UniProtKB/Swiss-Prot annotation:
One of its GO terms (molecular function) is peptidyl-tRNA hydrolase activity. The natural substrate for this enzyme may be peptidyl-tRNAs which drop off the ribosome during protein synthesis. Its main location: cytoplasm. This is Peptidyl-tRNA hydrolase. Its EC number is 3.1.1.29. GO terms for cellular component: cytosol. It comes from Pyrococcus furiosus (strain ATCC 43587 / DSM 3638 / JCM 8422 / Vc1). The lineage of its organism: Archaea, Methanobacteriati, Methanobacteriota, Thermococci, Thermococcales. It catalyses: an N-acyl-L-alpha-aminoacyl-tRNA + H2O = an N-acyl-L-amino acid + a tRNA + H(+). Belongs to the PTH2 family. The gene is pth. Keywords: Cytoplasm, Hydrolase. It is found in: Cytoplasm.
Length: 119
């Protein structure tokens, strides 16, 4: 069975986070964006959930690139979540760490993130 819906989490490669910290930030993004989809694009959320919740993690160069991707995604009607760290461990409070996009139709999500490299 092919996937028709997916979620992409974009992590900043310039922060050099530990693996554990990165995993937590990606998880925050995935859950927060899924909740946004549940509230605003329920049919996309439900289809994605039924299909097994496909997720892909890719990297962006910096915060500026995350904002650009967020703008592109929102223009296409995709749910997004920009995650700011609480700053309790490795990085200063308020540091933007990841952008989660979707879940949404795979072909729409790919218009925004298809050119990015896997993490």
């Amino acid at each position: 069975m092919g996937f028709r819906y997916k979620q992409v989490i974009v992590a900043r490669s310039d922060l050099k986070l530990s693996k554990g910290k990165l995993a937590v930030q990606v998880a925050h993004g995935a859950v927060t964006a899924a909740f946004e989809a549940y509230k605003k694009k329920r049919e996309w959320f439900e289809a994605w959930f039924r299909e097994g919740q496909k997720k892909v993690v890719v990297k962006a160069q910096n915060e500026e690139e995350l904002f650009k991707l967020k703008s592109e995604a929102e223009k296409l009607g995709l749910p997004t979540a920009l995650i700011r760290d609480a700053g309790l461990t490795e990085i200063p409070p308020g540091t933007i760490t990841v952008l989660a996009i979707g879940p949404g139709p795979e072909e729409v999500v790919d218009k925004v993130t298809g050119h990015l490299k896997l993490l």
